[in-house]
Amino acid sequence: MSQSLFSLAFGVGTQNRQDAWLEVFYALPLLNPSAEIVAAVAPILGYSSGNQALAFTSQQAYQLADALKGIDAAQSALLSRLAESQKPLVATLLAEDAAPSSTPEAYLKLHLLSHRLVKPHGVNLSGIFPLLPNVAWTNIGAVDLAELAELQLEARLKGKLLEVFSVDKFPKMTDYVVPAGVRIADTARVRLGAYIGEGTTVMHEGFVNFNAGTEGPGMIEGRVSAGVFVGKGSDLGGGCSTMGTLSGGGNIVISVGEGCLIGANAGIGIPLGDRNIVEAGLYITAGTKVALLDEQNTLVKVVKARDLAGQPDLLFRRNSQNGAVECKTNKTAIELNEALHAHN
């Protein structure tokens, strides 16, 4: 068959005693695989169309490896390794970027992000939460919560310890992929589904959620919430916050432009343009009243912070004498008014 796919990946995962998927590891996910690859694997897997997660056997893995030998050496080598697995295997084929409908599909979408094959908001994650089971992430891998107590007792009786690192829907990214050229001081603070660009350093206080991330290079010592993308050369100071779109009913997509600095313990609820600075300790929400100052420190007008969203070269600060939130710029009053009207 000659068919194009949005994505294709061969994985090995963990199932509970009811054979329900807990997680899937895809070593080499493909975005827009060639029609030649699809034509080679479809007959072996029994795939015809649509988005499907198909379990396959070790024997099929050998057949797939042989079929891809002259087409994609890396995928062929991976399948040869998967054929030796004692864990369940799954091939996930996505004809289109539709909302995921199974746990293997959901995990493939998260892998595409963390492998830097797509950027945040570049893949459909609608309805992903019910597809990600809440599991115990332990030193022996993912464990169904209903089976955890028995396994803990079993380990103790053998003089061993079953250590639970977290109980969550999302595993840490680095258990699945470590992107090239990054530093992550505390790996538990970066979830699978994060996009960590080359040159990014995530320090101990930094956190990056799924469907969020950094272009890189940059320094992250604050929270990059779900849906937030940080431009290259931007730094997030210790304990700072970016408002996400998952809580509070917010539907504004927050982003940080290039060359920005968000000070320690500061926060933003608006998208920042390039080369913006937010003073340490200052939290700006969309409705914050901001006194707009020109290059002569003259008050131009008072606006809501949302009116300044995406504007470049702004310094947000709090007046230490009267507490007013001010925005300083290197533009004249006339240029400022023109920019505001153009934005509206």
Curated annotation (Swiss-Prot):
Family membership noted in the UniProt record: Belongs to the type 2 tetrahydrodipicolinate N-succinyltransferase family.
Record: residues binding succinyl-CoA: R223, G238, S241, A264, E279, A280, G287, K304, R317, R318, N319, S320
Enzyme class: transferase
Gene Ontology terms: cellular component: cytoplasm
Residues the record lists as binding Mg(2+): E205
Keywords: Acyltransferase, Amino-acid biosynthesis, Cytoplasm, Diaminopimelate biosynthesis, Lysine biosynthesis, Magnesium, Metal-binding, Transferase
Protein purpose: Catalyzes the conversion of the cyclic tetrahydrodipicolinate (THDP) into the acyclic N-succinyl-L-2-amino-6-oxopimelate using succinyl-CoA.
Subcellular location: Cytoplasm
Gene Ontology molecular functions: 2,3,4,5-tetrahydropyridine-2,6-dicarboxylate N-succinyltransferase activity; magnesium ion binding
UniProt xrefs under Gene3D superfamilies: 3.30.70.2010, Hexapeptide repeat proteins, Trimeric LpxA-like enzymes
Oligomer status and interactors: Homotrimer.
EC annotation from Swiss-Prot or TrEMBL: 2.3.1.117
Designated name of the protein: 2,3,4,5-tetrahydropyridine-2,6-dicarboxylate N-succinyltransferase
